[in-house]
Amino acid sequence: MSPKARTAGPAGESTGAPGAPEVPTAPPRPDTPNAPAAGADRASRAGADRPERPGRTGAGRSGAPVRKGGAPPRAGGGPLRYAVVVAGLLLALAAAATASLALGSVRIPPGQVLDALTGRSGPSPFRTIVLDVRLPRVLLGAVVGAGLAVVGAVLQALVRNRLADPFLLGISSGASAGAVLVLVLGGGVGLVGGVTTTLALPAGAFVGALLSLVLVYGLARTGGTLTSTRLVLAGVAVSYILSALATLLLVVAGRPEQFQEAMYWSLGGLGSARWDTLALPAAVLAVGVGALLTLARPLDLLLVGEEEATVLGLDTARFRAAVFVLASLVTAVMVSASGAVGFVGLMAPHAARLAVGAPHRRLLPVAALGGALALVLADLAARTVAAPQDIPVGVLTALTGGPFFLWLMRRRPGPEGAAL
């Protein structure tokens, strides 16, 4: 017996009339009123039915870590995992700081380090080295690393590009060029430590960072739509140009006997760290991170998308401008204390995002701890690899950050970033 043929009725339902040829149901026309709603409903059901592992993030058009389906970013694991990650980073940072206090051109036994820190030892060369030379350097490295890492995490959200950081966007190079100009106009490049104790060097660095950011934005907008990829490319170009200009200023205006010291600082170094150079970076870090933590939710909205953030009430243009100014201020103060240290703001946020997910309320503290740990370890290597000669710490971060940058590009290739 032959099966009954079914025909489609007006509403797309089969009539079940026997002997009639089977006619497939036609999909609704795209221009009918119900088509968009139906498509959105199907997309919503598909996104809701698709299981997603905690912390799993996708890459948007610009590579920004956002959840599939346009939902806000999810935390990687629960509170226990977050606590374990923070505790582990604190322990690792304490161990790295202890090793940095003990190791160097002069090796100090751990017991002597502990006695110097607790005040149980009297005046001695070991106590002077620990308290007056190495401890300020370790603390400054932790502060600068934390500041650059937090700024890097924020910039990656602002431009929605995983390759963004203060160095690659030209902010660090602009701050360095502004600081070098202050040094040259201030009467010589040998006053790095002294000038840092005033507001002149950070102010010059801040102006240089802002001007660099404006220049990068202007170049990225030239000849087309502003996208995150064009922004990063313009930032890399401006970074190299400003670094060359800063070096030229040092060569032309610097006295030969002071040129090496200034070049060491411009390449990124913590050799000028003293107790009086630590207060301003530490204060700016505390205020800056506290302010950015209050902006965690708007930063999360930017990861979802420009249109979605606007619909939810965020003035994205004004928000970006304000956060860019804050990020430039933090970067300028860090650069004025340590020189241009690259790639810490690129590597630490990615490691933190893998550990605790994309929400910025959890990401920023972990990125700060990761950046502090990275720079303390890099400075330890800089002081011990070729002891008693110090290697500029920026050289070591570039040696590790460059391959990481290439790996990141190879790991997640994608089209040009979304329009900003």
What are the roles of these predicted feature ranges?
Residues 2-17, 21-34, 42-45, 50-420:
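Alpha-helical transmembrane segments in inner-membrane proteins
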